[in-house]
Amino acid sequence: MRIREVFSAIASAVLALQLLCVNLSAQSSPGNVTDIAVAPQYDTTHVYVAPEDFDRFVGSLMATFGGTTSKQGVFTVTPTPSSTMSQLVLTPVGTLSVFGFKTPIPYPFGAERTGYLVTDFDAAVQAARTTGADVLVTPFNDPIGRDAIIQWPGGVNTQLYWHTTAPSYKALQTIPENRVYVSADRVAAFVDSFLAFSHGSVISDDAHAPGVEIGRPSDTYRRIRIQSNFGKLTVLATDGQLPYPYGHEVTGYEVSDLPATLAKARAAGVQVLVPPYTAGQRTAALVQFPGGYIAEIHASSDK
């Protein structure tokens, strides 16, 4: 009886400890952060060009993808003194925030790849910290709202923003992908952090994706595709030994007719850096717009 009582007591203690651990984990889990995303059309790619290239760049985007623009203006969008031309480009395949600084660009601006609109700014900044991101630029006011710059594990910089008056953009025809290159050493930390923050899901995780996608057709690499209310995100985990221009493209734009889109792009002064190739259920090309912005453009190859 004593042995049975001892085992029973041990079992009860183990169960109590397990329940305590689960409870503590639930209280502290990054997965419990609030979902503060709005919609993919508010995930803006940030593009910095020289002021003299500004109009030509915006014009080439419009000629390639179509869409509309906001009124161009000159603003201070950093917490320290600066001056930049700024314009929003709303295309059916993605939204871009274009900057043409007339003054030196304060650090670390210019290194952020995208801006995410959030429903609750303070909660978003706290969620970023909770899920493992660094806050590189603490919250500050801009002419139309509030901003901060965060950095995910792996060195990926992102702007979080909130507008005093909520914007209203048309839903996109196709959702672009934020293309993030990270090292194999940091890919797990980046993915865990981003998933917890974004409430996203892994759509695919291919440990042997075709290397032609990163300019190395004889090799393979790891490609992870994630989707959330912020939009699509593709993680490219590589050894960093990439031929130009791979790694410079920030966004991949999905179109219905790649040859027609590339024809429009060429006519608008866009240079095709990597001719179309087919891999991973898409046909894709890499292009460079006037002003230097490099992008991937693709169409589904299984339609």
Question: Can you say where each PLM-predicted feature lies in the sequence?
Answer:
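N-terminal secretory signal peptides that target proteins for export/translocation
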Residues: 1-7
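Bacterial N-terminal signal peptides
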Residues: 9-22
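Core segments of cupin and vicinal oxygen chelate
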Residues: 36-39, 46-94, 130, 138-153, ...
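Vicinal oxygen chelate
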Residues: 40-52, 87-89, 101-127, 146-151, ...
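Catalytic cores of nucleotide-enabled group-transfer and carboxylate-activating enzymes in metabolic
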Residues: 96-101, 133-136
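Short, structured interface segments
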Residues: 148-169
